[in-house]
Amino acid sequence: MAIRIKLKPGREKSLERRHPWVFSNAIHNIKGKPEAGETVDVVAHDGHWLGRGAWSPESQIQVRIWTFDREEEIDREFFARRLQRAQIGRNDLIREQGLTGYRLVAAESDGLPGITIDRYANVLVCQLLSTGADLWRDTLVELLAEQYPDCAIYERSDVDSRKKEGLLPVTGLLHGTLPEMPVIIEENGIKIAVDVIKGHKTGFYLDQRDNRAIAARFVKDKSVLNCFCYTGTFGLYAAKAGAASIENVDVSSLALATARLNMQVNGLSDDNVHYNEADVFKLLRQYRDEGKTFDVIVLDPPKFADNKAQLNGACRGYKDINMIALQLLNPGGVLLTFSCSGLMPADLFQKIVADAALDAKREIQFIERLSQASDHPIGSAFPEGFYLKGLVARAW
């Protein structure tokens, strides 16, 4: 008999709208003794069936829903269908842009909560962030090996969010033979080196693909400051688009070494490129004090808020860094600024940048609103999937 999670009165509304999370404070009682990751049925207080998901006893999100179809069992065939659907949903994009690197599975937005899978050429990188995902690891690896027989499979489940599930970090080869690092992928006709072992996240920020191409429209014959550059790909696009000068700034010497490599693998000279291993916040203040200016500035900082308690501090951080960046822009210059925090609403982010402009005593115009690339879809019932917000602002 299925283990049953009964909700408190009135707490069924989000599931009836197909939001895939059940929080611990919504649960009335539990019929049975589920193990971590085990499949459970969720019912409303009056007993009517709502969904079927994975039990996570140590998390605030105690059930992540796999399916809202009562007839659908959670088994090997379920995961095979979900993986196939995810690939089909990306095939047009892959053909159109000639991609060899893309997000294959975007967790909740692809109906696979806690499961992220990125493809870099012939390497699949899995990030399993929930007890349910962890429980089905072997099945996922078997299916991926069948559906992508030429690919190695590597795990990068080494993020802090696993602690909230009571899970330890896990990394390593799951299937096949890993090629020598870095792997070279291609997007929009540009080659990019990716280290899936030592790189950020699963190795690279695939979600900024479209925004890199948009940024390239503003850089011809311009001076570009690329902040938090990681492996320098905004700068790489700028170099190919004819920027007069580029400064790539990051605290990581390893990331900057890969930025140099990216120029080389694309056959581009970096005579006009400066690689600066520095703290961006300190450097921007230094440049302001020195009176240094740029035509284009890219701000792509790491996440400032991991939870709601940190949001106010994040707002202050975003305002401060955008204010200083605007002070460094030449008249008519362009700022491309981003927030990758899912807790930051797009309208609030725009207000923060507008307030930063007031403090910087600069008049700005918002000329583009940016988001994540389309291989990072946003489920209609899962607004949390809309995490990357960006703005292009021209300053006068």
From Swiss-Prot:
Residues in PUA domain copies: 2-79
Record keyword Nuclease present: no
Function: Specifically methylates the cytosine at position 1962 (m5C1962) of 23S rRNA.
Main location: cytoplasm
Family: Belongs to the methyltransferase superfamily. RlmI family.
Source organism per UniProt: Shewanella baltica (strain OS185)
CDD domains referenced in this protein's UniProt entry, alphabetically: AdoMet_MTases, PUA_RlmI, RlmI_M_like
InterPro entries, sorted: PUA (IPR002478), PUA-like_sf (IPR015947), PUA_sf (IPR036974), RLMI (IPR023542), RlmI-like_PUA (IPR041532), SAM-dep_methyl-trfase (IPR019614), SAM-dependent_MTases_sf (IPR029063)
Top EC category: transferase
Residue ranges crossing the lipid bilayer per the database entry: none
Gene: rlmI
Protein name stated in the entry: Ribosomal RNA large subunit methyltransferase I
Taxonomy of the source species: Bacteria, Pseudomonadati, Pseudomonadota, Gammaproteobacteria, Alteromonadales
Catalytic activity reported: cytidine(1962) in 23S rRNA + S-adenosyl-L-methionine = 5-methylcytidine(1962) in 23S rRNA + S-adenosyl-L-homocysteine + H(+)
UniProt superkingdom: Bacteria
PANTHER family: RIBOSOMAL RNA LARGE SUBUNIT METHYLTRANSFERASE (PTHR42873), S-ADENOSYLMETHIONINE-DEPENDENT METHYLTRANSFERASE DOMAIN-CONTAINING PROTEIN (PTHR42873:SF1)
A Pfam family hit: Methyltrans_SAM
GO cellular component: cytoplasm
Molecular function terms, GO-annotated: RNA binding; rRNA (cytosine) methyltransferase activity
Subcellular location: Cytoplasm
E.C. no: 2.1.1.191
Keyword annotations: Cytoplasm, Methyltransferase, RNA-binding, rRNA processing, S-adenosyl-L-methionine, Transferase
